[in-house]
Amino acid sequence: MNLKRLPISFFVLLCLSSLSVLAQNDKPATATNDEKAEKIIQSVIEAIGGSTYLNVRSVIGRGLFTVYKDGQSGIPSTFVDYIVYPDRERTEFKGQEGKIIQTNTGDTGWLYDGASKSLKDMTKMQVEDFKRSIRSSVDYLLRGEWRKEGAKLSYVGRREAGLAKRNETVRLIYPDGYTVEFEFGAKDYLPMKILYKRKNADGEELAEEDRMAQHVKIEGVTVPFVIDHYTTSAQTSRINYQSIQFNSPIADTLFARPASIKAVK
């Protein structure tokens, strides 16, 4: 369920080792803006499932992941994504070059590359990327985890979202300056966009955007089945879910680092 986040494995495939930075636009929030933003959050929670959504503790998603370059789509890879809240995730990819597995658990993680037959611990930067992906997720916003970090919530206003459509926009600013904006349909309150900025390996500031579509209700929870990622207005990837399961048992062993390459399953 990508309300949680775009799995950081997708960003590894795109070679996005980066540092997120403060977005600089729009006016500062006021107390009134905060109240408006809080009401929007409550409306979104109700729209996507209310208590049923809030009671989701684990997610298993299956589908296709496609990289885009210069406006052209590549050959899709199949994926299985396992999430256990609040901070465990394992994503498995199968493509032309073999299998890739990336697993994160809090402050640790490991990566298996079937093509090169390598099994490595994640670098500190990769772990930090994973943590930032959580902080920029709709789930982190709706479940109120940002409050524990002392982030500031504000109402930005309405934005154009196509013919006769508008999105309500709220913003989170974390104490370290990391800024994320979330757009929700003004009529149905479904998640539509996530916007933030990052710096690439060359120190260049890039605008990132996740666009959500094809919302489907499953087991009482409404989720987007398509998530398109854009960098500086150019599409770089698409996630297309084929199935999503909530609260199915997920073994702890899935997240444990294998003792050797031969032990990878």
Please identify what each model-predicted range represents.
Residues 1-5, 24:
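Positively charged n-region of N-terminal signal peptides that target proteins for export
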Residues 23, 98, 161-261:
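Gly/Pro-enriched, hydrophobic low-complexity segments
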Residues 85-91, 110-113, 130-134, 192, ...:
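Short, surface-exposed linear segments at secondary-structure transitions and domain or protein termini
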Residues 76-79, 102-106, 120-128, 183-184, ...:
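Short amphipathic beta-strand/extended segments with alternating polar/hydrophobic composition
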Residues 25-39, 46, 108-178, 186, ...:
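Flexible, processing/modification-adjacent segments and terminal tails
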Residues 39-118, 149-158:
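N-terminal mature ectodomain segment of secretory-pathway/periplasmic proteins
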Residues 9-18:
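Bacterial N-terminal signal peptides
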